[in-house]
Amino acid sequence: MAKIRDPRFKLSRRLGVNIYGHPKAMKRATRENSREGKKLSNYGKQLLEKQKIRSYYGVLEKQFLRYVKKAMKSKERTGDVLLRSLECRLDNIAYRIGFANSIRQARQMVNHGHILVNGSKVNIPSYEVKAGDVITLREKYRKNDEFADNFLSLKKFSLPYIEKDYDKFSGVLIKEPERDEIPIDANETLVVELYSK
């Protein structure tokens, strides 16, 4: 399976934004070695925003293009549909619920069969979670200190489209997320412009 192989901190510094949320990711960044302060062409800005979103969700170019094409077929605002589709990937929802401390770790958990959707094991990270779907950490993995700590430590962090049940180690996507509810700092409109040429 193909992977994004850029070192995470280096990639964050190159894009000029902490896409992985790690406190040390931007530590070595300066105005000289980050994008901040550099003048970009319109194409450069579009490309940068695409790289931000792709890297944040950990999807490859071919995968990303499929999401863009699907969004362009919708009658809704293309950028909103694009981000909503990426946000509703199973690996991302597992991360948002708090089973993992990164999307990368959540993807690994899905691949290894640690996550259930409506009681059934799903090992496809790109699986599209629908409103009403119940995402659960399999019972035998709830005793894993790392997974349990991840989940319980995020009690204060909540999103309006996810409802958590800490007793059952589960979360429900209660509705499709709106753009202003999705916690990602990116300009998806520039991405749509890039692919509309």
Swiss-Prot record:
Any one GO molecular-function label of the UniProt entry: structural constituent of ribosome
Keywords: Ribonucleoprotein, Ribosomal protein, RNA-binding, rRNA-binding
Pfam family, one: S4
GO biological process, one term: ribosomal small subunit biogenesis
Ribosomal protein is among the record's keywords: yes
Source taxon at top rank: Bacteria
Gene3D superfamilies: Ribosomal Protein S4 Delta 41, Chain A, domain 1 (1.10.1050.10), RNA-binding S4 domain (3.10.290.10)
Signal sequence range: none
Every S4 RNA-binding domain range: 88-151
One GO CC term, this protein: small ribosomal subunit
Entry-linked SMART domains: Ribosomal_S4 (SM01390), S4 (SM00363)
CDD domains named among the record's database cross-references: S4
Keyword Phosphoprotein (UniProt): no
Subunit record text: Part of the 30S ribosomal subunit. Contacts protein S5. The interaction surface between S4 and S5 is involved in control of translational fidelity.
The family this protein is said to belong to: Belongs to the universal ribosomal protein uS4 family.
Known role: One of the primary rRNA binding proteins, it binds directly to 16S rRNA where it nucleates assembly of the body of the 30S subunit.
Name of the protein: Small ribosomal subunit protein uS4B
